[in-house]
Amino acid sequence: MTVELYVFPPSPRAFRVMAVANHLGIDTTLRIVDLPKGETRTPEFAALNPNMRMPVLKEGDYVLWESGAIMQYLAGKKPESGLLGASERERLDITRWQLWDVAHWDPACAVFAFEYLVKPIILKSGEPDPAAIAKGTELFHNFAKVLDGQLRGRKFVTGERLTLADFSIGAAMNIAEPARFPVEPYGEIRRWYGTLRALPAWQRTLAQCAMPAAAAA
């Protein structure tokens, strides 16, 4: 049965589920939703996700939203991949870092994404707000220190094996340069992201995200 992914490819939340599918070799059909045109705010899309957010997975009659849940569902199709961990403690550690991303890392990165990318390019609503940037910078450094420390002595977030935690947290780093993340002091984060970016699945997903919508669909 075909796995359909409703995504807006520039979003890190879309990227992470697309990258997991690519890494696992799961064939998917991408359904591109244009956020600036309001395509998530239609009755048809609300029937898929009442929150009117992407990404959404649809497989037959089964519909799942929230990127973390989608990633776990995809990884569950290929448990031998190790993306979910091999033991209960490993799975809990991976889940902990996925939740850390939702609670801390993603909101910190989102400040920069909104101020430097969404406002000027999508909303066309003016210059970045210095107060918002100052608050975002404080948040970013608080949590970048945590992540940098966690990566010290580890190839990936939870150890020597690639897991869903890496896809969850690493996706935002794709926009670090245009969104001006203050990541320069964090050598472990930069080293780790370089490892992720070199993955074939990561490269394939970056290429998909660069496609025109019609071609990607």
Q: Can you say where each PLM-predicted feature lies in the sequence?
A:
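GST-like domain detector, emphasizing the conserved glutathione-binding G-site
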Residues: M1-A131
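Phosphate-coordinating loops and pocket residues in cytosolic domains that bind phosphorylated ligands
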Residues: A47, G85, I169, A198, ...
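Conserved beta-strand edge residues that scaffold enzyme active sites
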Residues: L35-P36, A165, A210-M211
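Terminal-tail/helix-coil boundary detector
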Residues: W202-A217
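Active-site-flanking alpha-helical
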Residues: V20, A75, A172-M173, L206
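GST-like fold's C-terminal all-alpha helical module
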Residues: Q98-A198, A217
